[in-house]
A protein has these predicted regions:
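Metal-dependent polysaccharide deacetylase catalytic core of the NodB/CE4 family, i.e.
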Residues: 2-148
Length: 148
């Protein structure tokens, strides 16, 4: 599954009422307010599995293939944001959420930094610096899979 979570929404921090699970998403509304709820695939699938536990074999969920050009899981972790005051905090929060997802049965993979053609990119290692630090697999165009 390729899940694109850009800056206008993000996966929330751990929700302790849900057994420490990353249970909700935040979405910035047109009026600037923040709405929190099950607005994306991750919390929707978690809600479904809570109601139908036999759906998930041994607690497994899905593989989330991340890109990195706008950041990870809606957090501004891309190097283009390195001069912003919240950059280090955003990276730490994204790493915590990524670990929470792993602990809850989700797998994380790299879908490259931004749908790069790895063999012809000017900077083919950019995905390693920006995405591979939270994943153990690479999925390219849904056809190739690599695990180190």
């Amino acid at each position: 599954m390729l899940l694109s979570i850009y800056g206008w929404r993000r996966i929330c921090k751990q929700d302790r009422s849900r057994r420490g699970r990353t249970a909700t998403c935040e979405m910035k509304m047109d009026d600037g307010s923040i709405s929190t709820g099950s607005y994306d695939l991750i919390p929707l699938l978690n809600d479904f599995i809570d109601e139908h536990p036999d759906f998930s074999y041994k607690g497994a969920k899905a593989i989330i293939a991340l890109t990195g050009y706008e950041g990870i899981l809606g957090y501004r972790t891309a190097s283009s944001y390195s001069e912003t005051p919240d950059y280090e905090s955003e990276k730490e929060q994204a790493a915590r959420v990524a670990q929470c997802l792993r602990d809850d049965g989700w797998e994380l993979a790299s879908h490259s930094w931004g749908h790069l053609w790895m063999g012809v990119s000017d900077d083919p290692e950019i995905h390693t610096r920006s995405v591979m630090n939270v994943s153990t697999q690479i999925r390219i165009n849904g056809k190739m899979r690599w695990s180190p």
